[in-house]
Amino acid sequence: MKAQYFFWILFLIGFYWMIYLYQDFLMDALIAGLLCVGFFQVKVFLDKRFFNVVSSFLCVLILASVLIVPLYFIVYKSSNIIFEINFEKFSALIKWLKGIITENLSHFPTIHDGASKFLENFSAASITGYLLKISSYVGRYSLKLITDALFILGLLFFFFYYGERFYRYFLGVLPLGMNQSKKIFEEVAGILRIVLLTSLITVILEGVAFGVMIVWFGHDGWSLGILYGLASLVPAVGGALIWIPIAIYELYHGNVNEAIFIALYSILLISVLIDSVIKPILIVFIKKRIFKTTLKINEMLIFFSMIAGISQFGFWGIIVGPTITAFFIALLRLYENYFIQNEQKACE
């Protein structure tokens, strides 16, 4: 057996066992690596003023304030809301809602009977039990998310500290030319920077828009604005987790116009205008004006890759989706610019 074949057999065996050993941490390592790549320009800026260990720690501290603090805020506020529910008032609210729904559905006999049977099992006790189940699930999920976040932060320090060495090593190991490897890396890094900044600005815009509106109705605009901005990152439901309960609360107190305004404002101004119209425009602005990058990737493709990533990978899909898309497009462009051209030259 040739030494080369023997080496590749040993390498594949070792690679399999490495994947098996670290399979529970692969996603965390991937997220840490992507965050490091997207945030590395900040590290380069800090390196000019501090030692490597200090700048690495400061980068981790900044990301920790973005990842851990908001998560703690959500868990703390959500648990307070659930455990401070007044059962008597909540029962009255459910009874009132059932009456309103039954009264309006009486004009539609075809669905009235089915809805009535469904509402029979719809009570304050059942909803409270459901909320407690949700809170326990959220508690378990939040604990896992916090554990993953702490592990990611630990890996982030490692990646920031040895980032330059990792970069040079991978450029040398990849079976491509140095310029080809750099172009792939620059394309992925550029997309990550755009996505991270776009997501941060969108969360701030949506949170501020909701907080400024809701404060006029006597609610805590600061807390609800933060919760809405963070809830906007939740796949499928987003800010509806915040504005629907508030609209129901206003309805219960007879404030029909206020409830309708909150619903329309949240749907039309925030969900449609900010999330669906302003966000793609923001991607274009950040790409061309802030980073002044020459990336040849359509802005709408970046936008849809973020949506697809969230639907497949949850919260972290915001960066995983665009990364996969950018990497694949970079490979296609590499194939087009180098391999096809070389084949054409060989034919000539």
From Swiss-Prot:
Keyword check for Transmembrane helix: yes
Report the membrane topology from the UniProt record. Multi-pass membrane protein
The record ties this protein, via Pfam families, to: AI-2E_transport (PF01594)
Q: Which GO terms describe its cellular component?
A: plasma membrane
Q: Where in the cell is it found?
A: Cell membrane
- What residues form the membrane-spanning segments? 6-26, 27-47, 56-76, 143-163, 194-214, 224-244, 266-286, 300-320
For this UniProt record, the keywords arranged alphabetically read as follows: Cell membrane, Membrane, Transmembrane, Transmembrane helix, Transport
The record's section on InterPro entries has: AI-2E-like
The record's annotation in PANTHER family points to: TRANSMEMBRANE PROTEIN, TRANSMEMBRANE PROTEIN 245
The name this protein goes by in its record: Putative transport protein HP_0567
Q: Which organism is it from?
A: Helicobacter pylori (strain ATCC 700392 / 26695)
Give the organism's phylogenetic lineage: Bacteria, Pseudomonadati, Campylobacterota, Epsilonproteobacteria, Campylobacterales
